[in-house]
Design a protein with these regions (language model features):
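Catalytic machinery of carbohydrate-active enzymes
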Residues: 1-357
Length: 357
């Protein structure tokens, strides 16, 4: 049951990573801010994720730098030294690292995910749980943290600052092209990467529709190599910005794009925060749980067919169930994705503009 909190109750968020998840959490945190504008909010977050969200207004961020090992915990405790316990701690991550952090933080109420959703000793850290519900998408489950603090039902919305410098840099990277498809081909798990030949063919198809194609990626060598391979395979020129952007510049690229295409990755969820159409490529996880929020109608979903072919229909409703196998992405056909692109381009719908301030 929702419980009212005082008008100045202090709230701590524990969600360290990853990019997609912190994008989901941002919508929840900003809903809490709207309902409880006088409640101070502290968010303990990873170093990389902080570069994307660290300028969100009205939130105190404390960086948890996992590269420091135990020193990361000491750094957090040092910054909180002398403070009263938080009134509420929202334990929104269940990894061992984040659960250990939640355990040592002082708070009167420690609220965790619904029973059955946690792992890594999550239940030993929290003294309350978000009530179970029919919610299946990760963001909808996270909304339970807001509801338990008496926040009424809300549609997910984001207001993430993008500076004029970052917007200008993004425009320069794409040579001031106004209509472009942004390819985000990589994923944290290499099994989720679609065939480079398919990406190149998709890029050529987009060119035939009068679009510029931009390929992005992190500075990791694997991403650099993948982007270069796609560019070499394509018959038409692709603007390659892999390894050349900060997360804020990438966010600006997502905002300015006509459409973003890629597998389950942080970039797709960043694009969702900017209300840019997203074509998600899903074979390993259920897009109705991890897909681009507000954009599930444009998902190339082979997951359901693969699950059915393996007689795993019951597991379809199991939260967190994933398939494994490098061959699974081959089930996503180029024709499916080009058809989805046609649908996006024929639609005038782009969700209402979002604030960059």
């Amino acid at each position: 049951m929702p419980q009212s909190i005082g008008p100045r109750s202090s709230i701590c968020i524990v969600r360290l990573s990853a990019i997609g998840d912190v994008c989901h959490v941002t919508a929840v945190v900003q809903a809490i801010q709207r309902q409880h504008p006088q409640s101070p909010i502290t968010w303990i977050i990873g170093r990389l994720e902080h570069t994307l969200l660290g300028d969100l207004p009205g939130i105190e961020f404390i960086i948890f730098d996992k590269s420091k090992g135990l020193g990361a915990y000491r750094d957090v405790l040092r910054q909180l030294k002398g403070r009263a316990p938080f009134d509420v701690l929202l334990q929104m991550q269940t990894s061992f690292r984040s659960n250990l952090l939640g355990k040592i933080l002082r708070a009167k109420r420690k609220i965790g995910l619904p029973n059955g959703y946690g792992k890594e000793l999550h239940n030993l850290v929290v003294n309350e749980h978000v009530p179970g519900s029919e919610a299946f998408h990760v963001l909808d489950v996270y909304k339970g943290f807001a509801h338990i603090l008496d926040v009424p039902p809300f549609d997910a919305a984001w207001s993430i600052p993008i500076s004029e410098n970052d917007q200008r840099r993004a425009r320069e990277l794409v040579n001031h092209n106004q209509t472009y498809l942004l390819l985000a081909p990589s994923a944290s798990n290499s099994e989720r990467i679609w065939n480079p030949e398919n990406y190149a063919a998709l890029a050529d198809y987009a060119h035939s529709k009068g679009m510029t194609v931009v390929v992005t990626g992190s500075p990791a060598q694997r991403d650099i190599d993948l982007a270069r391979q796609i560019c070499e395979l394509a018959d038409n020129a692709i603007v390659n910005v892999a390894g050349k952007t900060s997360l804020k510049e990438l966010l600006a690229l997502c905002r300015q794009a006509r459409v973003v295409v890629g597998p389950d990755s942080g970039t797709l969820h960043m694009a969702t925060t900017q209300q840019t159409p997203v074509i998600g490529l899903y074979a390993h996880s259920n897009p109705f749980r991890t897909g681009p929020y507000h954009g599930l109608s444009y998902v190339a979903n082979s997951y359901a067919d693969i699950m059915a072919s393996r007689g795993l229909q019951k597991q379809m409703k199991q939260w967190g169930y994933r398939l494994k196998g490098a061959e699974l992405m081959r089930e996503i056909k180029l024709e499916t994705v080009t058809s989805l692109l046609d649908r996006v381009l024929s639609s005038t719908e782009k969700r209402p503009s979002v604030s960059m301030n």
